[in-house]
């Protein structure tokens, strides 16, 4: 190879790797920088495989659901953000014992099936009921008002599970940097989500963050249970606002539920995808 051709190849190589070099050196200061009046539409979909034991029998259930939700920024101060929201629709499908039941809150026909109607009764406790919460500009949750929802534990876990809001560190971070945060998804319980965040990529106006978390609990909603598991995945956020664009979380959970002195072991494997778009 001549000296000229060697220099040409070297130049092409440097051009090829330069975007990766620039990306590795890029740093960002992530925080929630939204305005009062901003409205975000959410779609949350999840597929779960549930295996549980009862009466010495092992049973399996496939469960998938979609929630459609709106969150509006009602107030922004120098140290807090107030969010008002509601869930407007759910589509849920459950398969067990060879039967498949689907409930769509926007389709009255789906509620004609007695089992679907029973599912609908439960979902009506949370659909179109307002809730509110506050957080600081780094994503640390403050007050959460779910009093209008008669069955709010699952919603609380979802809102505060790490699938919608990352907790950002103070100051600038670079690709490869990691930080940790302990999250309590349900107030008054000992459930904990210990999350490790890693900035994986910055591209244009979006940043990709890896999540590697451990979930533990011994008591949830007054029910004695042992829960251990992992939640891993990625979330893409807007660099300018810090707000979620899309997240994918994979869950692997083992739990024992205690009722009347009996234990019911179960395993849950699933993937939850959350997408958010600015409406206004």
Tell what function each PLM region has.
Residues 25-101, 174-280:
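Acidic, serine/threonine-rich low-complexity disordered tracts
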Residues 80, 94-100, 104-192, 217:
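Structured extracytoplasmic
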């Amino acid at each position: 190879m001549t000296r000229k051709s060697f220099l040409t190849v070297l130049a092409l190589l440097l051009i090829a790797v330069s975007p990766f070099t620039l990306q590795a050196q890029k740093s960002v200061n992530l925080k929630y920088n939204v305005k009062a009046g901003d409205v975000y539409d959410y779609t949350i979909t999840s597929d779960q495989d549930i295996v549980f034991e009862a009466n010495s029998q092992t049973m399996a259930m496939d469960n998938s659901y979609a929630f459609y939700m709106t969150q509006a920024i009602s107030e922004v101060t120098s140290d807090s953000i107030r969010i008002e929201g509601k869930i407007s629709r759910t589509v849920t499908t459950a398969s067990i014992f060879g039967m498949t039941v689907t409930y769509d809150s926007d389709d009255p026909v789906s509620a004609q099936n007695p089992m679907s109607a029973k599912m609908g009764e439960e979902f009506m406790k949370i659909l179109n009921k307002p809730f509110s919460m506050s957080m600081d500009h780094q994503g640390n949750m403050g007050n959460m008002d779910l009093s209008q929802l008669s069955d709010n534990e699952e919603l609380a876990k979802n809102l505060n599970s790490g699938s919608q809001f990352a907790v950002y560190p103070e100051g600038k971070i670079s690709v490869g940097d990691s930080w940790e945060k302990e999250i309590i998804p349900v107030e008054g319980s000992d459930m904990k989500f210990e999350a490790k965040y890693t900035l994986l990529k910055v591209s244009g106006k979006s940043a990709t963050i890896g999540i590697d978390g451990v979930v533990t609990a011994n008591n949830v909603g007054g029910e004695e249970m042992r829960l251990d598991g992992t939640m891993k995945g990625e979330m893409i956020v807007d660099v300018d606002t810090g707000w979620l664009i899309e997240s994918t979380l994979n869950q692997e959970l083992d739990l024992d539920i205690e009722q009347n002195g009996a234990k019911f072991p179960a395993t849950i494997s699933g993937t939850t995808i959350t997408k958010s778009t600015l409406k206004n």
